[in-house]
Amino acid sequence: METRWLHITSENFPALCDAAKGVCVIPMGCVEKHGLHLPLGTDILEASWITYEASKIEPFCVFPDFTFGDVPENYSELPAGSITLPVETEMLLLEQLCEQIARNGFKKIVIYNGHGGNNPWLTTFLRKVENKPHDYVVCVAMMPLVAPHKMAEIIDEQGKEAVPEMNEEDIALVK
C-alpha cells in the first residue's frame, strides 16, 4: 500500500488512515550548506528517505517534507542556497499542519527530525502543543547520526575525535 500522503488518492485516503492506525510521520530537516560535497537538502533528504523506507516495514502515513529548519546564523551571512525562517513562523506553520493532519484522521503525529538545529525550538513547540487541548498527540524523534555499536567501534579504533566525522555524510552515502 502507498503510504505517502501526496501519492494517494482522496478515495484511498481513509484506507491509509486505517492501515496506519492513525499514525502520521512528518519528515523534518532544513536546507543549508553541508560541506563542499553534500547537497543543501542533506538533512531533509535523509529524514524523508528513512521515513519512507520505515513505512514499508510498519505502515504509517508519510506527510510531505517539512524543509524549513532553523539555521541559527545571521541571515545576511547564510551560504548560498540556504533557507531559514523565523522560529515563530516555523512553529505556527507546524502547529497548523498538525491541526490539518489530525482533521484528516491521524491523531498520533510523529515529527522525525533530521536537523539538530531544530531541537531547541521543537522542545518549545511540544510544550506549547501540550498546553492546549487537542484531539491528537505529537512527539519528536531525532534521527540518530551513528549507530551506537558503530560509534563504540570507531572510538576504540580512532579515538573519540573521529566520532563527529561519522554523521550526515555516512547516512548520505548509505542512501
What residue spans do the PLM features occupy?
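Active-site and ligand/interface coordination hotspots across diverse enzymes
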Residues: M1-P39
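Active-site histidine-anchored catalytic micro-motif
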Residues: T3-I8, G69-V174
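A generic structural signal for alpha->beta connector loops
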Residues: G22, I57-F60, D135-V137
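Fold-independent oxyanion-binding glycine-rich loops
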Residues: M28, D65-F66, M143
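Glycine-rich loop at the start of a catalytic domain that most often binds anionic cofactors/ligands
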Residues: H37-I44, Y75-P79
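Short catalytic helix/loop segments, enriched in acidic residues and glycine
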Residues: D43-S55
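Short glycine-enriched loops at secondary-structure junctions
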Residues: F60, P64-G69
